[in-house]
From Swiss-Prot:
Active site (UniProt): C410 (nucleophile)
Residue numbers binding [4Fe-4S] cluster: C76, C82, C85, C164
Alphabetical list of PROSITE patterns matching this protein: SAM_MT_RNA_M5U, TRAM, TRMA_1
Protein name: Uncharacterized RNA methyltransferase alr3654
Leader peptide range in chain numbering: none
Protein's organism: Nostoc sp. (strain PCC 7120 / SAG 25.82 / UTEX 2576)
InterPro entries, per the entry: Methyltranfer_dom, MeTrfase_TrmA_AS, NA-bd_OB-fold, SAM-dependent_MTases_sf, TRAM_dom, U5_MeTrfase_fam
Family indicated by similarity: Belongs to the class I-like SAM-binding methyltransferase superfamily. RNA M5U methyltransferase family.
Gene Ontology BP, a term: rRNA base methylation
């Protein structure tokens, strides 16, 4: 088949040779690239072309002709349908190889670093049963049964679950029971097309070290007759459940949580032990979903920095202080910068609760706060959202020249972009790059880059 005759709907044979950063298998056909979900390098497959462009196409696995040695039987019975995990069909050791390769490729292609010093991927506990948080959209089946699960790949159709192998198994009993109770009380499920109904999502969260659980219903406006009574029944039925909340989200939006969260039974937070400190974690708090690996990455950061107690540290995008507070015990002063006022309030409470008094928190956008700090910190910790750092943040760092920067990223493409800017003209040098598997069974990877101010950076 020549390049000009490739059409949507055709079946083609492809040898999968790589994985994309979104988790799809990548092969070539007629000098063009083909992206195929649910495949593994080493697979020989028959692919149905779905979306065809001049130089590439997206296809669907039609038939597995020859399996890769890295292909395994998924540990989840709905892995082929559910959009929650992309890689349950891939041997875990190969997942780690692929993630390290993904980091190296991005740093080379986007960052322009010829030989980035990328360590093997950091792992800790099991690659299943690790998630401390689950947020399930709800739906109603054709027979009127309440369903909760994850969206089917490429759609908003809910794949109904009673358990999920990547979630902490202590959350599974609540998933099945809450669906049953919603059904019995005949509470209306939200219909996103008509913007009618009430219950949009079920949120479950657990302290991995304490076992405490929070249950949250995300609702359109909260009109659920008998919800307070039902919340008390849930607390009595499940001793590990410490709080039930309603989050109000009245908007036509794909955002899960709205701005207003109200505790209707128990307490509005769970307690979690992280790095030897006790944190209060609320339903809508950002907290890494793999507690053990997040803690292991913090230990790498502590070891690499080797703080001596005289330093000033700025933690940009600090959230509730998950990294700020443990590191504050090793420096003279720590300053956390965070856009969300609610997160800063929690960070202050967490600091007070743990008796930490050498830390302060400031509310505001990092790109506005950092240039006005008026100090040259010894260490700056960056942990931005997926979009990476604003250009003003990079320029501020290049102007103030802190001796060391630790950049933690959940999207390696934006990390590579920002590192390229920071290392322009040799101002900073990459000392080490440590990736960590915060999201086993998916294509996502967390990365920490350690930068030091070079001699030329000091001289300029």
């Amino acid at each position: 088949m020549t390049k000009s005759t490739w059409h949507q709907g055709e079946l083609i044979e492809v040898a999968i040779a790589d994985l994309s950063d979104t988790g799809d298998g990548v092969g070539r056909f007629a000098e063009r690239v083909v992206f195929v979900p649910d495949t593994v390098p080493g697979d020989r497959v028959l692919v149905r072309l779905l979306h065809v462009k001049p130089n590439y196409a997206h296809g669907k696995l039609h038939q597995l002709l020859e399996p890769s040695p890295h292909r395994i039987r998924p540990g989840c019975i709905v892995a082929d349908k559910c959009g929650g995990c992309q890689w349950q069909h891939i041997d875990y050791e190969y997942q780690l190889i692929a993630k390290r390769h993904q980091v190296i490729q991005a740093l080379q292609r986007i960052g322009g670093f010829a030989q980035p010093p990328v360590d093997p991927v950091l792992v800790t506990a099991s690659s299943l049963g690790y998630r401390n948080k689950a947020t399930y959209p709800l739906d109603v089946s054709a027979t009127g049964q309440v369903q909760a699960g994850y969206y089917q790949k490429g759609s908003h159709h809910v794949v109904n679950l009673n358990q999920c192998p990547v979630q902490d198994p202590r959350l599974n009993p609540l998933l099945a029971q809450v669906k049953q109770d919603i059904q019995q009380r005949d509470w209306p499920i939200y219909d996103e097309k008509r913007h009618q109904g009430q219950i949009r999502h079920l949120g479950l969260r657990i302290g991995r070290r304490t076992g405490e659980i929070l249950l949250t219903l995300v609702v359109k406006d909260g009109n659920l007759p008998g919800i307070e009574q039902q919340a008390q029944e849930w607390l009595q039925r499940y001793p590990q459940l410490v709080g039930v909340s309603l989050n109000r989200n009245p908007e036509r939006t794909n955002a899960i949580f709205g701005r207003e969260t109200r505790c209707i039974a128990g307490v509005p937070y769970l307690r979690e032990i992280f790095a030897g400190l006790e944190f209060q974690v609320r339903p809508d708090t950002f907290f890494q979903v793999f507690t053990e690996t997040a803690e292991a990455l913090l230990q790498v950061i502590e070891s690499q920095l080797n703080l001596q107690g005289h330093e000033t540290l700025i933690d940009a995008y600090c959230g509730i202080g998950t990294l700020t507070l443990p590191l504050s015990k090793q420096v003279r002063q720590a300053i956390g910068l965070e856009l969300q006022p609610e997160a800063v309030q929690q960070a202050i409470v967490n600091a007070q609760h743990n008796g930490i008094n050498n830390v302060e928190f400031q509310v505001g956008a990092v790109e506005k706060l950092l240039p006005k700090m008026g100090i040259i910190p010894d260490v700056v910790l960056l942990d931005p959202p997926r979009k990476g750092c604003d250009r003003i943040v990079i320029e501020s760092l290049l102007a103030s020249k802190p001796a060391r920067i630790v950049y933690v990223s959940c999207k390696v493409a934006t990390l590579a972009r920002d590192l390229k800017l920071l290392c322009t003209d040799g101002t900073y040098t990459i000392q080490r790059i440590q990736s960590a598997d915060f999201f086993p069974q998916t294509s996502h990877v967390e990365v920490a880059a350690f930068l030091v101010l070079s001699q030329s950076g000091k001289d300029n």
